[in-house]
Amino acid sequence: MLTQTTLEQYFRDLEMLVNVDSGQDAPEGIRRNAEFFRDAFDRMGWLTELQDIGPTGPCLVVRNREAEHYDLLLTGHLDTVFPKGTAARRPYREEENTAYGPGICDMKSGCLTMLYALQEVPAEVLEKLNILLIFQPDEEIGSIYSKELMCAWAEKCRVCLVFEAAVDAPSPLHCVQRKGMLRLGFRFYGRAGHAGSMLTNGAVSAISEMAYWISRIDTLVSREKNTTANVGLVRGGIGNNVVAAEAEMSGEIRFEFPEEAEKAKVLIRELYRHAEATGVRVERTLEGYEPPMNPTPQTLAYVDHLNTLEAQNGRTFSIRKRGGLSAANFLSQHLPICVDGFGPAGEKAHSEDEYMLMDSVAPSIRLTAQAICALAKEKG
């Protein structure tokens, strides 16, 4: 039974977590918060392991027992996007039903909900299930150190709940579909020369070639398929009277359908051929790929099941597509059921206005505990 005393302790713990800098320049803060969760699960008698996987801080893996396969994976990230000193400058604060602070909904409250929900589940229920939790230290930089480890664990799991924040709405919005992302970055090398003599001096503009690439990349935008293309950073040249010898651009393609990423790759190969024909050398400076999270039939059936559980609480389990990335993008490729947005409701992540709705905490904890109990009942 979730009591007021328990909720008060939740908010005290949340204040402590939020007031610890946890950006990529503060791995000691990420470690400190990981140790908080490790110690809490140690007291519960669970198996815990802090794994040093990179310079961002440790990844915490928690299990209720050793097992070949796990019924449930709960996961969240301990890092934020904010630089060291942010927590001191704008610490945790509460205003009526709203709590503010760096990383409060993205996603320290979600990580804490995982712990508190499991504390609400009766021991006899936990005995029936094999449960795994992963607290990652590097989601905000693309999970570059933790992804391989997390995917290996996901292969052993049936259901995954990701505790990114639910979207603030009359009925909090969860997520089973996220766009994938293809990251692009290129440096262009032309040939410098006086702009007034470029027709005869052999000068080749790196900026002109880059501009051609941008115009072609923009053709990938599709309202019908909800594909976006954005070149967000460009630079180049040294003066108006000098044909630019160098230029650089970076951007990304976001897509629901994997074939849209393949279409982009075909275009990039074509653009390389164009650059070669115009005398511009192109070097790739950024690359990265995240698959889209698209719901399996099993996931959609599980959403119906969660809606049935929420109906017992007088609520609905609502879902909405999201354009942003999370660990669910890659985890969903490795197991049959994956649902994101299981944390308390909030908005405005990555900004000074980031907030969490305090009255969404108890429903988030209760639903998670109910979902765990239902898994045990299903297992028999």
Regions found by a protein language model. Give the residues of each.
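Acidic/histidine-rich catalytic neighborhood of metal-dependent amide-processing enzymes
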Residues: M107-Q177, S222, G380
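Zn-dependent metallopeptidase/amidohydrolase metal-coordination segment
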Residues: R315-E378
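Short beta-strand segments
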Residues: T75-G76, I134-Q136, L161-E164, R187-Y189, ...
